[in-house]
């Protein structure tokens, strides 16, 4: 597998750029340290609820997470997750609650990761992705998979422990491959899932199966979904996608066949596009580009040679 690191350096994919946060995993089991960090006046926290946070606009027009000093944040009916520290030693926590707090001013508003990830700084986007992933995992794994008893939160949100049998459960991450497939004529293969509306096309993707390498997964998914055979596979970049717990592994893949035979179960339609054809389809509205935060958009851009239009993006 070769990599496209040089091609992505100038425009890093959303949620992959360095966040400047040290996750400091060695502190997660240190209750005394966590208590001291929580009570420190520099510590900041924010609320996550249902995959959303509050964001606000700064005086200079940037967008940031709405955070408060931790000592001002009540822990009533909230789960506390330690997210890490920055270079200045500031600690960051997320509070999982049933609802977001009341807006602090008229400009603050709730936002999910798909929207906020495009607007926030690398630091804030990384903190939000971490918090949303933990919230999703906590919500879906409340009971022990070994004995069925209810588990409790440990390690500042990064472990669920079963008091009944002693089992420890860790946050789940599901690897998935996503690939921009091109052919000998340098066309790109895009597909439309069965539940997507007309015009919504993107790169092919699928989960890695047990006992399978990521390269094997790329070739299998393309063959299963559209009947196209893939040869060389080139790794590009990865992207956390906590909806609820995926890690997207992005590839460029070269097809050794071009005949399309969609499976009808996952993919309803698939087409080869030249750059001119795709550009014209974007312009006419025949094809809607993927949303800018997604690794799918960046994979297509690497082939397309320029940013995708934002009008009509999904």
Residue spans of the language-model regions?
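N-terminal strand-loop-strand
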Residues: 160-202, 207, 229-230, 253
């Amino acid at each position: 597998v070769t990599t496209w690191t040089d091609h992505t350096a100038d425009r890093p994919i959303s949620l992959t750029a360095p966040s400047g946060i040290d996750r400091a995993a060695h502190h997660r089991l240190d209750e005394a340290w966590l208590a001291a960090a929580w009570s420190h006046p520099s510590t900041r926290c924010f609320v996550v609820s249902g995959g959303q946070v509050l964001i606000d606009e700064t005086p200079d027009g940037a967008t940031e997470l709405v955070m408060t000093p931790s000592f001002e944040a009540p822990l009533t009916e909230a789960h506390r997750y330690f997210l890490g520290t920055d270079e200045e030693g500031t600690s960051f926590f997320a509070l999982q609650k049933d609802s977001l707090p009341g807006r602090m001013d008229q400009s603050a508003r709730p936002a999910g990761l798909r929207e906020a990830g495009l607007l926030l700084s690398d630091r804030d986007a990384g903190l939000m992705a971490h918090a949303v992933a933990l919230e999703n995992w906590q919500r879906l794994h409340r009971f022990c998979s070994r004995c069925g008893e209810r588990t409790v939160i440990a390690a500042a949100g990064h472990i669920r422990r079963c008091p009944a049998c002693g089992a420890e459960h860790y946050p789940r991450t599901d690897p998935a491959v996503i690939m921009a497939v091109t052919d000998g004529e340098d066309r790109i293969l895009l597909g439309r899932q069965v539940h997507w509306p007309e015009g919504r096309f993107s790169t092919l993707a699928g989960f890695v199966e047990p006992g399978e390498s990521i390269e094997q997964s790329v070739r299998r998914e393309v063959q299963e979904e559209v009947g196209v055979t893939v040869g060389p596979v080139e790794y590009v970049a990865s992207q956390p996608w906590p909806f609820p717990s995926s890690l997207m592994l992005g590839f460029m893949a070269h097809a050794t066949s071009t005949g399309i035979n969609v499976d009808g179960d996952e993919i309803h339609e698939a087409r080869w596009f030249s750059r001119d054809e795709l550009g014209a389809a974007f312009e006419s509205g025949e094809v809607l580009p993927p949303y800018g935060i997604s690794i799918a958009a960046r994979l297509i851009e690497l082939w397309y040679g320029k940013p995708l239009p934002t009008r009509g993006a999904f």
